[in-house]
Structures are given as C-alpha cells and as structure tokens.
Amino acid sequence: MDQDIAEARDQFLNQDFDEKTFEIPADKTIEYARLCGETAARFLDSAHPDFQAPPTFIASLSGSRALPENFPRFGLGMDAGKGVECFLPVRPGTTITGRTHLHDIYSKTGRSGRMVFAVSRIEFFDAAGQHLANADSRVVMREKS
Amino acid sequence: MAISTIQEVVFGEDLPTFIPDTSLAIASQFAKLVGWGGPRFTDHEGARKEGLPGAMVPGILNQGYLVAMIHHWAPDAEIKAIDTVFRAPVIADEKHTISGVVTDVNEEDGQVEIDLTVANEKGETRVFGTATVQLPLG
C-alpha cells in the first residue's frame, strides 16, 4: 500500500466526523418510490400496515460534509458509486440521525495514473437508537499526472 | 410470473428485463425532489455547457431503478444490501435497459445475490451493481 494512503487510513478511518438529523416526510418517500418505478403498496400507500421508505431512499440523504476536515485533496473528486445496507425499515413520519465516518480509503493505478477512492459511510439510527441502515458514498479522486 | 419464495429461484436465471423511465421529465423531477436541481439533471443544453453529452439521470435514481426491478420480479423481496458503480453517465431521454442475473441462491437463509446492469441502446454498460436480497422461505 502507498505510504500516503496508509497514513490517511491511520488518521481518518472509522472516526465520526459529522452528525445530522433528517426528517422523513411520507410525501417525499412516496414520490421517490414512484419516480424509481416502484409499484409495491408498502412504498406507495401511507395506509399500508408496513408503509416504509424505499430501501435506497437513504442514499439521497447527505451529511453536513462528505469528507473530514483536513482530508488530503488527492485530486478532483467524482461520484463513483453508492452502496446501501438495510437492517430495519425507515419509517416515514419519523426523524432519524445520521453519523458519518470514513469507512475505507484505497488506491488503484491504471494507464492514466493513480486514482484514490474514499468511502464515506453514514450510519442511520432511529429515535430509540436502533441501527436502521448504512449508506456508502464512493468518491474517486484522479491524480494529475 | 412473480417470485414468491426462495424455492422458486433458479441459480443463473435472468430477471425479466426492465425498461426504466429515463425521460428528462422523470430525471428532473427526481433531482429536484432530492435537492439536486442543477442543469446537469434538468436541462440538456445546460448540461452540454458543463461539458456533458446531455442531461444525466441522477446516479441514485439508477440505483432506485435496480431495486424497483427486483421488486417487480419478487414483490416481497427485502433488499439487504445493494452496491452500485456509476461507470458512465446515463443520459436522459435515451432508452436504457436493466438486466439482472441470479448469481447465488441460499435456500437455508432465503438470500439470493443478483448482478445488475444498466445499459444503453448501444449495449454499453453505464451502471452495474450487486444486490443481496431476502426472500420468504415458503
């Protein structure tokens, strides 16, 4: 592993650097589901007994900052992907809390040079402290050669 | 026919092809809903001025299409995890096709893994990903 990547991992991984609360409005989760093409009533009908936000709704929630303060700028950042893990349904009409940390930092070297990837993870909890879901944002920074 | 239980899933089977609505109207409504109302998602000409080939479908909307496809195949499926890679822009108003294939079936815990791809009319992969899905044991 490159020395600067190892140092960044030591300094930044697995330390919460942001906390934010999010209201989950039912009309917004229903519209989100509709635009995605969902047809299941549990995502579209607020009267359904198992009414819930669509699983990837949390991917649309952003913390106050994507990377920790003083994180090295390896290059221009671009959105390289999203991941979601679901443990319990996110219920519309509730307020949830998201805590963000850097989950991974790694590099790949190709023909155009080195690319550094940073994975920010937001862990979402309900008011009772139950861990509902994780949302990962993968940013790729291409270094200038 | 919709899948109801894990016993109905066959390793290697293709999910029914899903044609998402990648119109500019949908992309634009979605971008505004999540607070990303910039021209790159709402206006072809504005996106071109930013150096893009046209307005894009937001990446997380593509992820939403993939999950909707799984729910069309198996309405009671619970998404346990989905990871998506945004390989290239999905341009709004261009036709795209989503395909999926079952790459693992665990009849004991009811979980399946599905590889998913969003491709344009040239057959170029724009987004790909993997989902882990929980199905009823039956």
Per-region residue spans from a language model:
Chain B
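HotDog/MaoC-like acyl-thioester-processing domains
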Residues: M1-L15, P89-G138
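A generic structural signal for short beta-strands and their flanking turns/coil linkers
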Residues: F18, I26, G37, E78-I82, ...
